[in-house]
Amino acid sequence: LLPIIRTQASRCMDCGIPFCHQGCPLGNIIPEWNDLVWRDDWDAAIERLHATNNFPEFTGRLCPAPCEAACVLAINSDAVTIKQVELQTIDHAWERGWVVPQPPATKTGKKVAVVGSGPAGLAAAQQLTRVGHDVTVFERADRIGGLLRYGIPEFKMEKFRLDRRLAQMEAEGTVFRPDTNVGTDVTVEQLTTEFDAVVLAGGATAARDLPAPGREFTGIHQAMEYLPWRSEERRVGKECELKC
C-alpha cells in the first residue's frame, strides 16, 4: 500500500497557490508532506503533518476532504488522494512507534481548565499541556472523547484509536475529569478561582431540525438520539443462542 500512496503523493504539483491548503479547515501544509512522502521520508512527513493537526488519524478517517475538492489537479484530472496520504502517514507512524508522549521540558506554573473533551477540547488541551501549563479537561459524560466517543460509529473509527491518543495525553500530563458537569458539579466561580484560564469547548447538544413533510411521523429520530446509544455497544448478555 505504501508504494501506491507514494505514487499518489508524487502527483502533487506543489502549486504556487496551494488551494488544497486553503481548502483545509486546519490549514494543513499539504504540499510539503506530500513531497516528503514521495521522497520516502515518512518520519519527517509525520512531523510536518503533526505541526498543524494533533489527531490526523481522526481526520484521515472522518474528514470529508475539502482539500481534494480544492486540488488544482482536479480541474482536468483526478485530484490527489490527499486524505489517504494523510491517513497512511499517521498509521505508518503509529506502527513504527514514532507517535510518543511529548511532555514539556519546563512548567509555566499556570493552570488551564478545558470544558469539553471533543476534538476541539482535546487538541487545545494537548497543545496547552505541551507548552508547560497544567491542564484539566472536564467532561460531563462518563468517558472522555465527546463526539469522537459517542457520535462516531465503530465502523467509521475504532475506539482504540481514540484511547491510545488519550493515553498519550495523560502521559504528557493532561488530567481528565469525566462525569463532571460544569455548572452543576463544578461551578463557574470555582473554575475562574482555581484556574488562570478557561477554554470553553463544549459541543452543540441541540440538533438542527428540518421542517420537512412527514417529520412528525413516528419512528423518525435525530442522529444524536441513536448514535450515543449505539456507540455504548449495549447488548443483552455476552453470548446468544440461535434456534431455528
Can you describe what each PLM-predicted range is?
Residues 1-111, 159, 198-228:
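Ferredoxin-type iron-sulfur electron-transfer modules and their immediate structural context
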Residues 1-3, 233-240, 244:
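Conserved small/polar residues in nucleotide/adenosyl-binding loops
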Residues 8, 87-238:
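Residues forming the flavin
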Residues 29, 50, 54, 68, ...:
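A broad detector of the eukaryotic-type serine/threonine protein kinase catalytic domain
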